[in-house]
Structure formats: structure tokens, C-alpha cells
Amino acid sequence: MIKLKVKKGDEVVVITGKHKGKKGKILKVFPEDSKVIVSGVNVVKKHTKSNQMSEGGIITKELPIHISNIAHIDPKTGNPTKVAFKFLEDGSKVRVAKKSGEIIGKEGK
């Protein structure tokens, strides 16, 4: 299993595949499969049959995509960037955009 540099709520962009260029927030992370669900990306329609518990119909939902197909969005420039880890003076470990040096995620807010 590889070290994931993504967290729920991160802003990402799809860099390969049929959804290339789409931006969204990470809704859920599956570390065991190295996949994530991104809002508005890889949306499919699922037809469901009615039963005693729920009505039938068409449901739209997002399917997971592999983390190698996404890149973080640099908070300073808005362009795709790679992520590095850095230790601050107080000893805390944060994620940093390699292009601009800005802190990524909730740690930077």
C-alpha cells in the first residue's frame, strides 16, 4: 500500500482519462484500493428496481477513480501541483505544494 497524500475535502483536478480537466473536492478516500470519489467526476446513472423499502428510479452517483489520475490544485496559482511533506518549527508535519510552497489543506487555514 502506498502513502496517500490526499484527504477528504482536498481540491483536486483530473489529469488523465475521459474526465481530464474536471475539478472537484474529494468526498471519500479508499486507501486500501488507492481510489477516491471526487464530486462531479465519473458520474453514472444507476437504474434501481422498486421494492418494499424504496421506490425504483434512476439514481446518479459518483464512482471512484484511481489517485494516479488526479493532482492537487495549488492554493496560490490554481494550477495542478505535486505534494511534499514538510515539518514546521513547532514540529508538526504539513502537506506543501511543490510549485509555490503553500500549505495544502486545513493545516493552512
Swiss-Prot record:
Give the record's GO biological process terms. translation
| Pfam families in the record | KOW, ribosomal_L24
Is-annotated flag, keyword Repressor? Answer: no
Q: Which PROSITE patterns match?
A: RIBOSOMAL_L24
Q: Which UniProt keywords apply?
A: Ribonucleoprotein, Ribosomal protein, RNA-binding, rRNA-binding
Which spans of this chain does the record mark as coiled coil? none
Q: Which GO terms describe its cellular component?
A: ribonucleoprotein complex; ribosome
* A GO MF term: structural constituent of ribosome
Q: How does it assemble?
A: Part of the 50S ribosomal subunit.
Can you tell me which family this protein belongs to?
A: Belongs to the universal ribosomal protein uL24 family.
- HAMAP family for this protein: Ribosomal_uL24_B
- Outline what the protein does: One of two assembly initiator proteins, it binds directly to the 5'-end of the 23S rRNA, where it nucleates assembly of the 50S subunit.
Protein's UniProt name? Large ribosomal subunit protein uL24
- What's the source species for this entry? Rickettsia africae (strain ESF-5)
